[in-house]
Amino acid sequence: MLQISHISKTFNPGTVNEKKALNGVDLHLNSGDFVTILGSNGAGKSTLFGAIAGSFVVDEGTIRLDGQNITSLPDYKRSKFIGRLFQDPLKGTAPSMTIEENLALAYLRASEKRSPFSVVTAKDRAGFREKLAQLELGLEDRMDHPVGLLSGGQRQALTLLMATLVTPKLLLLDEHTAALDPATAEKVLALTKKIVAENHITCLMITHNIPSALSLGNRTIM
């Protein structure tokens, strides 16, 4: 499903700030895998996610997804089939736009049958409301509220929904509960487990929480 072969990346080569972030990394995921990644800060975990998502082009090696070579594919094209959540709840949503508008953007971006000029229909809105209700956060009754008014946990739950609104081939979770309080983090992790399982999503999750890594993943990499 995901085949990463000997990828390497050096930032600022030839300068005093040169940093070898990835060095001959190999990784293989089967369809439906939930793989968790544990490691110290600066070990290159987030850089690996950046390489997969297309945030930059690797210096060498290949990345294949469902047999397609995506090594040189730009990030905006990969976003149609790769979902990603960051540690910071402020990333992944547009704070000045409403909940409905954020969901509409995510839906239109990921849906291959839509163009950027497509219009969200009443049926689409009903679908958004139904999905929001499944979060059990009351957001289905606040669709016209700006996202900037939501708590960190609510925003992260919304971002999770946006990333999976159209089922991605691969979901990248980059310590997506690290900035939340323990109770909220547990709720978001439970939502993550539910959404991933129900939609049979292949998932990679970075975490420093060993119990979460062992309970959620069918394989853990250190």
Label each PLM-derived region with a short phrase:
Residues 175-176:
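Walker B catalytic motif
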Residues 163-164:
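ABC ATPase C-loop
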Residues 53:
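Helix-to-loop junction immediately C-terminal to a conserved catalytic motif
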Residues 1, 10-24, 74:
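A short, flexible loop at the N-terminus of ABC-type nucleotide-binding domains that lies
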Residues 61-69:
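Conserved ABC transporter NBD signature motif
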Residues 15, 69-83, 91, 114, ...:
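ABC ATPase NBD coupling module
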Residues 207-208:
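H-loop/switch region of ABC-family ATPase nucleotide-binding domains
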Residues 38-40:
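The feature captures the beta-strand-to-loop junction immediately N-terminal to the Walker
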